[in-house]
Amino acid sequence: NGTLAAFVDALHELDIDVSIIDYQEHAITAGFDADAAAYVECEVNGIPVHGAGIASSINVASLCAVVSAVNRALTELDE
């Protein structure tokens, strides 16, 4: 996914190292304007985490999933 790769590259510029291990996506409603869900398993600065995102666009849902995972990892680092 080019959008996801570009986002991961941008995070790297902020010293947030994200390695995506697994990525899944699917529609959660039917029809032309279906909402999408995305799930990522990744390592953020060496911490294994999962993230999920839901949006009307699969690209936005994917970005939200990565943000969710990054937030989880950064919270663990702060503890």
Where are these regions (language model features)?
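Polyanion-binding surfaces on beta-sheet-dominated domains and ring/shell assemblies
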Residues: 1-79
